[in-house]
């Protein structure tokens, strides 16, 4: 049975809230951006306002999918500025009482991975990534965002 769109949206919203909570517990002020804000979900920065960054959240519900889906158009991320990040959130299975897992990277690095994907140069728009396909140093790499904000 196909998953209704509103349930999929709840999964994405849960991912955004998890990321906001992780940033908050690290003392990083942040806010959810409006739903129609293009390519980003959260704004985070320093209290003095000297550094800000934008974060795109990609959530995956393991009871419904085993991969994160990116698109051919996300290859353009390879040219994004250093203040843009992606956080992949593996929501964890409620059936197994699992917690979330996170992979954090600069958006530029994610764009490069999209270009290196086997579907690059084909008519296939999908760029599917399983958690095992991500570079190991992306997992729980919250320091990537912290380092940027502390520059």
Language-model features: locations:
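Mixed-charge (Asp/Glu-Lys/Arg
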Residues: 1-38, 43-151
């Amino acid at each position: 049975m196909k998953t209704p769109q509103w349930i999929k949206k709840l999964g994405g919203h849960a991912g955004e809230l998890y990321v906001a909570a992780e940033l908050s517990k690290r003392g990083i002020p942040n806010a959810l951006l409006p739903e129609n804000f293009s390519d980003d979900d959260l704004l985070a920065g320093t209290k003095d306002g000297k550094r800000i960054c934008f974060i795109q959240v990609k959530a995956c519900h393991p009871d419904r999918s085993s991969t994160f889906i990116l698109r051919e158009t996300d290859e353009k991320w390879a040219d994004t500025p250093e203040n843009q990040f992606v956080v992949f959130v593996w929501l964890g299975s409620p059936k197994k009482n699992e917690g979330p897992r996170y992979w954090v990277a600069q958006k530029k690095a994610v764009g490069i991975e999209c270009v290196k994907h086997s579907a690059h140069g084909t008519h296939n728009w999908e760029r599917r990534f399983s958690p095992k396909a991500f570079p190991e140093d992306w997992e729980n790499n919250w320091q990537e965002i912290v380092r940027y904000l502390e520059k």
